[in-house]
């Protein structure tokens, strides 16, 4: 059994490997790949399947995607989904997105007939975003924390001290920030 020997380590620096090993010391079946500007480790840890995203140069961790069983979702997320308008849709997959300095998101992929949706919930059960699922493999790279070149995070924290950032996206040359403040 070679599950303790990571695959494709030649793709990432020793610093990235060390940062990964410090964060997930018990990881098994680790396999590295480069996706865009990120070094991504797919692995098993703590009874589940995960993908962790790192900066290949600085070795900074950005995000971990974790496969989650529907019944293991936090109670507020389960309750919100069961009471929501997509409760009668079939649940296809559930992922947890843990991100550096940002709100943890739970993505419930649902389908009904030919329609497929990704439902993004905060850990408090707020449905923050609904996205049509295109059927392509989802990496959630749009939800990776972005460099804060314009000091946006500091501005948000100054104006909304109790807010958590859900998403920062660039649209038509402008940056749009989605926050949760007092569970709204």
Predicted regions and their residues:
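Bacterial Sec-dependent N-terminal signal peptides
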Residues: 1-8
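N-terminal trafficking/processing presequences and adjacent post-cleavage segments
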Residues: 2, 50-51, 65-67, 71, ...
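A charged, solvent-exposed segment within the mature domains of Sec-exported extracytoplasmic proteins
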Residues: 92-146, 150, 162-164, 171
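Amphipathic N-proximal alpha-helical interface segments
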Residues: 38-66, 105-135, 177-184
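A cross-family detector of function-defining hotspots
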Residues: 28-46, 90-109, 165-182
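Short, non-transmembrane alpha-helical segments in secretory-pathway proteins
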Residues: 8-26, 70-92, 141-165
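Short, charged helix-to-loop "capping" segments that act as catalytic/coupling loops
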Residues: 55-58, 84-87, 100
């Amino acid at each position: 059994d070679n599950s303790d020997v990571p695959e494709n380590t030649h793709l990432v620096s020793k610093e990235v490997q060390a940062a990964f090993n410090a964060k997930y010391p018990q990881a098994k079946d680790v396999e590295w790949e480069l996706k865009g500007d990120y070094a991504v480790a797919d692995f098993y840890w703590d009874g589940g399947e995960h993908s962790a995203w790192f900066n290949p140069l600085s070795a900074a961790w950005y995000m971990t995607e974790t496969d989650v069983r529907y019944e293991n979702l936090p109670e507020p997320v389960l309750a919100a989904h069961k009471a929501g308008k997509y409760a009668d849709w079939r649940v296809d997959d559930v992922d947890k997105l843990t991100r550096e300095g940002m709100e943890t998101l739970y993505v419930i992929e649902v389908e009904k007939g030919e329609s497929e949706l990704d439902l993004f919930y905060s850990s408090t059960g707020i449905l923050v975003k609904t996205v049509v699922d295109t059927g392509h493999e989802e990496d959630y790279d749009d939800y990776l924390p972005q460099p804060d070149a314009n000091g946006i995070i500091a501005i948000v924290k100054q104006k909304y001290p109790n807010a958590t950032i859900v998403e920062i996206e660039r649209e038509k040359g402008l940056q749009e920030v989605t926050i949760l403040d007092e569970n709204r």
